[in-house]
């Protein structure tokens, strides 16, 4: 087909994946030939992790040694290098230069050892060093690997190098020319190279297979002893012929030489790690179309040729789920026989050693939802069962548990797979490299006259680059970019979001080519809607492969099918022409989203339900659990309602698109902002990605109008881009938490895209995106709190962030880095402290600080422009010298009001300079947190002395220190003095008992300042509480909040507490969680609650051993009490009958309860309905298992 400007958009152009991997797609009913030649970079997910990188120059031996070295952590690897330097310096024959060892990473070091020592000595030296480091497990693993990777037979050693280009089907001299030509980026030369490669591959295939068979001879001879060597050879010969032909058909085997590092990586995929874990299942996961199936097939071929798993597996069987599903019932025996050359497989002999079998299950996603319908398992490999039962049984190691598995699955299917698979190792398959992606977009997607401008546009569009990892999507994007470059006939939207690019492709393919009209007629629109309906039902049912019945149900006949083939949207399956798939899953998601828009044309806009028979309403997506497999459909739906895409859609359809869909999507996002407690970080991030697809600033602003606080997990570049775009249009945002992980390269000197011209290499792509994100944070007019807890930031990232937060317009008052990894760039923070006059609170909890860091911090705090009021240095690994510096700040900083050193080894020695500072009249500190600091009674003596003279300190936390009764006695003596200003005292888990309570009771008698006391997790027992109650009944005691969690209390103390509840005019909160009060104890408390004089507003009865027997008394008390607003009843054993009584009390008009701690799921449906009715009757009531307070920040001051 041709468009204006002479642009040729034939089938070959459509699927030209990259300069190095050209493939073609025919327009007739033949195979869809997808380009699936992924690079296999270092990236693993889930348990257990192994780090991998590949290099074309690595031999199996050096790669095996590299695998062992990757087992070392950073410190161990440095130790290994030091020991190697020592050994090398002592050697008189082969010494490696010291500087080369010092500068080598894992890959280089493995190569250096092989270069200077040779394979055998390299392994022996490494094993010796492992033993010196006392790494016995790794040493044993290395010995096993040495035997496999460094055989004595020199010919075998050559075989282990991996096949040469002359010995692999489809690899020839032309491929080398093709690789060189690709670098020159000339389409004509690339085409010539591909033609030459095709001819050469055809001429040499027979010779290469023969050579591979000769190579296999030695291996076959070794297995002959097992009694079926001939059978093995026949099977391998059959596999080589079959899979070599498949690779040749796909035209994707020209990169085999470059892919050999993948094979080397997979060679060790089943090896034990340093902890002794050895998986029997390896999962290859990645994006749809990334090349997982191609890699799986290549594994089979590589094994058959003798290059992989020799000596480990006698047989490797390829089980494509899609083809297996065609039979209602089968057995493992039948599947094996079907793969055998003459269908007469020696099954008994094969199954006699299951530990030498490898099954490759390709396409776990193709099972769809069938696994949800049946949980049956099978143990007999000869028994006939539905294919999904056999697959589940293999995955769960019920069937042939000793065998090994490789499973391919899309990223979106990994969560479902995790519930089926047993102890797997996950390996991520990533697509083509950044350099290849840029080449692809420059050569295929941008006109020659736009190269310079286009390169800058590509570099700025990280989403576009990221999606081009998948060759099929990259091909589609290239065509779309070309369409957008054409002016005139094309109706493509000028929008470079993925929705815009997919729309450019699909709308162009659907547009009639006639001169008279450019829009679809009614009949064509009906066909389009039917087709899109099939797509949407496939999305919801997790179905991506369709058969004739699916087409028939939707009323799609042969003529419509031919049209879809011609448009390269729906294609015959590459493995079976009776089935049909979309060119890529993203096209199915796009068409599914388009269905909702088409449906709205036939219904009044205000009533548009976005509903089909087997799907969910658009507004029910959140409530129904919009699973990850349908995320892109939702994102495309948002993109379709944007102005840039809607206008060309209206041209195509020949009628206006109603706005009902847009209004419902707007409402869905708004709901997330209105219910922040019910919104997960993933929900918010998903909404941001959806909004990003619209590129409509006004729409985004309206959607985010209700958002005041957000939590975003930033795990990839696209998350950062979408978040940056949305947050700058979030008008009332006040608090944000961002967990940034995995987006910054470990080696900051590494260039992300070497193909980029030198004049554009001043910053990496991610640095530019991060700078934009930080600029938004620094200039947002309403943002007051930034939490980067758990983030991993490099030195450059920290420098950029801090530079933006120093901006005069930055309004941030609270900056939090709790448990963040920012040590390399922490020095940049102190300039913010001095420059940003709005910053009031800084939390560095969990950040390791050196003495120099603390010195710089103290210098910043001394600066006259510093107005910091709160500093948290929890668990920062501080030393005694640090406390000396910090104590000096307490006497010189007029602004610092709160200091936390929790989790540091302050000890009694460190408390002394801090106490000295507190005694100085210039000290303005009000809150001091010394939780878990190793303080004893000796340190209490210093603190007690400071409390006497200090007039400012009102909050003191000494929890989790071994103070004992003696230490508390010293503190209480000071607290009894009139000059002590202490108001809140935390003594949780300080080894206090009844005697300690006696000292505290004496202190309370003469202290009118203390209002909050926490004694949780101390064995004070009933007698201790009774001593406190004696004082609390007195009007002179002003205690408002008493925490007695897990204090070994029983019903014996409840009468005393009840008396306090009824008589005290000050006690507002009492927490008795995790004490064995029982029904009798609570009944006694209820007597106090029923008294009119009770002012208690908050009562904690979690895990107090309550049953339905106390519900009557509790209900009566709740009905009478008008002050109690918060009640925690979690983890108690109430029957439905008892809960019905409580629900009646909750709903009573005289009850003022607003926060009720209960696990709804713990009770039957009828009780859950009653609780929901309470919330409908009283909308302000919160019923939740996570009991909280309206004054969380104030109540838990020592935590925030």
Curated annotation (Swiss-Prot):
Its main location: cytoplasm. Changing residue 1107 to I: In OZEMA19; uncertain significance. GO terms for cellular component: cell cortex; cortical granule; cytoplasm; cytoplasmic lattice; cytosol; Golgi apparatus; intracellular membrane-bounded organelle; mitochondrion. The keyword Mitochondrion applies. SUPFAM superfamilies: DEATH domain (SSF47986), P-loop containing nucleoside triphosphate hydrolases (SSF52540), RNI-like (SSF52047). Phosphorylated by PRKCE. The keyword ATP-binding applies. Changing residue 23 to D: Found in a patient with features of Silver-Russell syndrome and multi-locus imprinting disturbance; uncertain significance. Changing residue 107 to A: Impaired formation of the subcortical maternal complex (SCMC). Changing residue 533 to C: Found in a patient with mild cognitive retardation and multi-locus imprinting disturbance; uncertain significance. Changing residue 289 to E: In OZEMA19; uncertain significance. Residues 142-152 have a biased composition (Basic and acidic residues). Residues 173-182 have a biased composition (Polar residues). LRR repeats lie at residues 704-727, 730-753, 780-803, 809-832, 836-863, 865-892, 893-916, 950-973, 979-1002, 1007-1034, 1036-1059, 1064-1092, 1121-1142. It comes from the Eukaryota. PROSITE patterns: DAPIN, NACHT. Residues 57-148 form the Pyrin domain. Changing residue 354 to L: In OZEMA19; uncertain significance. Component of the subcortical maternal complex (SCMC), at least composed of NLRP5, KHDC3, OOEP, and TLE6 isoform 1. Within the complex, interacts with OOEP, KHDC3L and TLE6. The SCMC may facilitate translocation of its components between the nuclear and cytoplasmic compartments. As part of the SCMC interacts with the SCMC-associated protein ZBED3. As part of the SCMC interacts with the SCMC-associated protein CFL1/Cofilin-1. Interacts with PRKCE. Interacts with TUBB3 at cytoskeleton microtubules. Component of the subcortical maternal complex (SCMC), a multiprotein complex that plays a key role in early embryonic development. The SCMC complex is a structural constituent of cytoplasmic lattices, which consist in fibrous structures found in the cytoplasm of oocytes and preimplantation embryos. They are required to store maternal proteins critical for embryonic development, such as proteins that control epigenetic reprogramming of the preimplantation embryo, and prevent their degradation or activation. This is NACHT, LRR and PYD domains-containing protein 5. It comes from Homo sapiens (Human).
